[in-house]
């Protein structure tokens, strides 16, 4: 075999092995995501994020109100 064929096959095997390794590494995360979706954890996380966003908006409005009431120097 010529060297260019060997290099081509080597890179092809390297790419396939890398993709298989990445796929096998993704499987535990996918399983964990499915389990948490079935248990409803994601819904609770979204609810807490909405509350944090509302609190942030409230604090931001209070800060704007405070800055508007400060005298200009």
From Swiss-Prot:
It comes from the Eukaryota. Residues 45-73 form a propeptide. The keyword Signal applies. Keywords: Amidation, Antibiotic, Antimicrobial, Cytolysis, Fungicide, Hemolysis, Secreted, Signal. Stable to pH variation. One of its GO terms (cellular component) is extracellular region. It is found in: Secreted. The modification Lysine amide is found at residue 39. Expressed by the venom gland. Its main location: secreted. Residues 1-22 form the signal peptide. One of its GO terms (biological process) is defense response to bacterium. Belongs to the non-disulfide-bridged peptide (NDBP) superfamily. Short antimicrobial peptide (group 4) family. Antimicrobial peptide. Has a high antibacterial activity against the Gram-positive bacterium S.aureus (MIC=5-17.30 uM), the methicillin-resistant S.aureus (MRSA) (MIC=17.30 uM), and E.faecalis (MIC=69.23 uM). Has antifungal activity against Candida spp. and one Cryptococcus neoformans strains with MICs values ranging from 6.25 to 100 uM. Also shows an inhibitory activity on C.albicans biofilms at high concentrations. Has a moderate hemolytic potency (18% at 20 uM). The primary structure of the mature peptide is identical to that of NDBP4.23-like from Tityus costatus (AC Q5G8B5). Negative results: does not inhibit the Gram-negative bacterium E.coli. Does not show antifungal activity against Candida glabrata (ATCC90030) (MIC>400 uM). This is Antimicrobial peptide TsAP-2. It comes from Tityus serrulatus.
